[in-house]
């Protein structure tokens, strides 16, 4: 076991605080409408420019092990806020820094750290309850657009695009962010179910001008295995040919003789066929095939349930109004599935979303719900250069998370005003002893930090504006973008309640633990032992 270095008391806390301040100072320059950018060097490719707090935090690794421990703990605050609400990472970091700095001053003055932490916790619990009281529902598209605009660094176009996307695919719909082709941002809405599998052979293409396969009123054959023998499919193909309808085959794979025969039949015009691979892998593929079956009113031909492809009939096939297949995607429009069955399938998947602990699984399940329930909106981000594209995409992503959080728990006045009002309402809160009272004051004082930092980043005097806001009432605050005082809600400066709540809870949780630290242990750096010297020629060993 490697030797360790141990630091105690004030010496340990000072080192930890230095690390906290280095990371927080780098992150907090990005806060507010006039926050600055941070440039991150990458080991390959161009540097990344970002205004996203968690992206800055993740890049920081300090050489001094004790400082690094402090920095890593604050990094955890930003990461947790990002995971919970998808935004508010910079606010959480600023709050954590303020609580740690004020708290450690109180510890140095002789307060009991455990009582300080209890006081901080008490203040935060009361503050969260007060935030819920101040919260207003995010009712209309205008409010959604305003939340998106604020989170995207006052970019109104992004706010409007997100509101439009939510309007089209519903509050639960999937909205994805992709690289655009031009300079302008665009919104594309995919109606029906789309999955990322294209045609298996370019010979299926019947619209050469668009390079796509379009099938009107087709049958859909769903097979949960590889198909390589055409004889298995002959009964189905004959039935489809008699009906005079096109056919889409969705299978694990279609290869060899089977694919060749389908291509020949299509080219000769005997039967209009297209084949695609089933989306997903393993169990997820089975589930997605079932989703398509529900949507189209078909049955998955699976040997697991004793069904054979040779015995499949037209009754087992799904139907849809139209299918469009490109090189990369397949879109099924207007499946004829039973609406009640689709609804119960959606409810079943939503239940799985509640139960899963994996973020990846949750995301995939939500995509399945959207595909069954309402379609998918794609925001295509336009920019002049790749560096700008990355920065803008990160902002749009943040704005998207913020609007979802706003729809979920409502909104409060933005610009740090909500926390200032909460702190004012809790001025009379008391703990069980004097040290807890100091802890409460530490937390309440820290709640002013986001407002102060927004003002500092706007180049104004923080104390003057903070006092003016504190003397106001309700939603009265300072708009750093226009440099005017007024009603924050009327000016469209809103923060999602969930974002503000999460930032405060995670910041106080980690900061409280740091205040109660008395000892820090880290590995000593390994000393490089000098290499053994060359032995050289040994005397008396000359060649005979």
UniProtKB/Swiss-Prot annotation:
Keyword line:
ATP-binding, Chaperone, Cytoplasm, Isomerase, Nucleotide-binding
GO MF annotation terms: ATP binding; ATP-dependent protein folding chaperone; isomerase activity; unfolded protein binding
- In which broad location class does this protein mainly occur, judging by the first location in its UniProt entry? cytoplasm
Q: Pfam families, per this entry? A: Cpn60_TCP1 (PF00118)
Catalytic activity of the protein: ATP + H2O + a folded polypeptide = ADP + phosphate + an unfolded polypeptide
Example of a GO cellular component annotation carried by this entry: cytoplasm
Q: Which residues bind ATP?
A: 30-33, 51, 87-91, 415, 495
GO BP annotations, alphabetical order: protein refolding
User: Which E.C. number(s) belong to this protein?
Assistant: 5.6.1.7
Q: Where in the cell is it found?
A: Cytoplasm
Q: Does the keyword Cell membrane apply?
A: no
**What CDD domains is this protein classified in?**
GroEL (cd03344)
- UniProt-listed InterPro entries: Chaperonin_Cpn60_CS, Cpn60/GroEL, Cpn60/GroEL/TCP-1, GroEL-like_apical_dom_sf, GROEL-like_equatorial_sf, TCP-1-like_intermed_sf
Query: What is the recorded function of this protein according to its Swiss-Prot or TrEMBL entry?
Result: Together with its co-chaperonin GroES, plays an essential role in assisting protein folding. The GroEL-GroES system forms a nano-cage that allows encapsulation of the non-native substrate proteins and provides a physical environment optimized to promote and accelerate protein folding.
Query: What family is this?
Result: Belongs to the chaperonin (HSP60) family.
Recorded hits in HAMAP family, A to Z, give: CH60
Self-association and partners:
Forms a cylinder of 14 subunits composed of two heptameric rings stacked back-to-back. Interacts with the co-chaperonin GroES.
Q: What is this protein called?
A: Chaperonin GroEL
Q: What is the lineage of its organism?
A: Bacteria, Pseudomonadati, Pseudomonadota, Gammaproteobacteria, Aeromonadales
